[in-house]
Amino acid sequence: MAGTARHDREMAIQAKKKLTTATDPIERLRLQCLARGSAGIKGLGRVFRIMDDDNNRTLDFKEFMKGLNDYAVVMEKEEVEELFRRFDKDGNGTIDFNEFLLTLRPPMSRARKEVIMQAFRKLDKTGDGVITIEDLREVYNAKHHPKYQNGEWSEEQVFRKFLDNFDSPYDKDGLVTPEEFMNYYAGVSASIDTDVYFIIMMRTAWKL
């Protein structure tokens, strides 16, 4: 994925700069996540998923507040309350965190989403809806990796490092879901102005 690290750095710098003037709580939270790079929003999603003990995909205010604290998000309590109110659309005291993450994700055009899903489907060789090391063996030759060639990494490590790009730094399980893949590229997408350039980059990177 040539260029992604550079985009990541540029995006983090841009996000930090914008944070100094942003006043909308959703925008401020989005920028704080993007300031950590492409995986920032996905990482926050993982924190919330771990906290969702009963797997009902919802969070109450206390859980929401704790999740933001655990992820070291800097926000006033009033801001967090306003955020929560905006997501608690029916006023029942809980928010749906899938909806929350979707709103937090930087907006992307339909063309960008389509090319991201094309890449996901190409990588998901077994068609089970997640990308694993087994899938990568089919599409990616680890033996060409310089660290494999110099004996520093095993084949397994090369694949694992590759998946770690998309996996959250807070809970690396070696599985990449469509949601994680989309969240990662939403971060990359935020640093690329035109659809044309983004689509060319994706097609080149994944030989689509």
Swiss-Prot record:
Keyword Calcium listed: yes
Keyword Metal-binding in annotation: yes
Domain (EF-hand): residue spans on this chain: 39-74, 75-110, 111-146, 154-191
Residues annotated for Ca(2+) 2 binding in this entry: 88, 90, 92, 94, 99
Localization (cell): Cytoplasm
Positions of disulphide bridges: none
Any Pfam family the entry gives: EF-hand_7
Residue positions binding Ca(2+) 1: 52, 54, 56, 58, 63
Alphabetized SUPFAM superfamilies for the sequence: EF-hand
Keywords: Calcium, Cytoplasm, Metal-binding, Repeat
GO cellular component: a single term: cytoplasm
Molecular-function GO term, any one: calcium ion binding
Protein name per UniProt: Calcyphosin-like protein
Native species: Homo sapiens
